[in-house]
Amino acid sequence: MKRIAIIPARSGSKGLKDKNIIDLCGKPLIAYSIEAALETNLFDHVIVSTDSEHYAEIAQQYGAEVMMRGEALSNDKATTFMVLEDILKNRLQESIDYFVLLQPTSPLRTSKHITEAIEKFESKIEHFDFLVSMKEAEHAKVLVNPIDDDESLKYFDTDFSNYRRQGYKDYSPNGAIFIAKPDSYLEQKHFFGAKALSYIMNDKDSIDIDGILDLLVAKLLINSDIE
């Protein structure tokens, strides 16, 4: 099968400055995703989409191909769908069976995870169009509700003091791996639904670098033997 990996990496960040290339244990954050993709030896192309020449240089240094974004896709209003649509419709010079989206903020997602996800997807590719990596949710959905403008808890109408987990588990996307057939994704514009498979990852490997606390935890995990 013909497959590509896409790693989106816009420059700047509202939280951590230049988050996608911030140093994590001696390597820029994006390097972890590039190296994991290349180590699988499963992709025809490993592509970094960026608006920054500096990011492009780093990506190429670690072995990725680069697609520079146009001005319309270089601001914080550009969605993931818009970036992927541009690549799939306008930039790709060949047909593919599917693509794998790897967010650069998941440094503990390894080549083993990617390979397992691909194997699972391909084993059921006749019946599914998407795959999304998931983790067990920290809180069941019944425990998560908005707080009203008047700061009351009127949306929390369960007796939480007597709450016990039900027999089923709740899961949430961890942002590490998304797989899709191009036509299905362009039509649906997201990765979820009845035609999407799940790939479960543990909490440790699911860490997503969004703020300084996430970065510190990732450093601790990388430098330790915590499983």
Provide a role label for each language-model segment.
Residues 47, 53-100, 109-119:
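Short phosphate-binding loop-to-helix
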Residues 198-200, 204-227:
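Hydrophobic helical membrane-anchoring modules
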Residues 22-23, 48, 101, 207:
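Conserved SAM-binding loop
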Residues 82, 107-195, 201:
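Conserved core of the sugar-phosphate nucleotidyltransferase
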Residues 2-7, 30, 45-48:
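Hydrophobic targeting segments
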Residues 3, 44, 97, 129-131:
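Conserved acidic residues
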Residues 1-17:
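N-terminal nucleotide-binding beta1-loop-alpha1 segment
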Residues 29-45, 62:
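A short, N-terminal amphipathic alpha-helix
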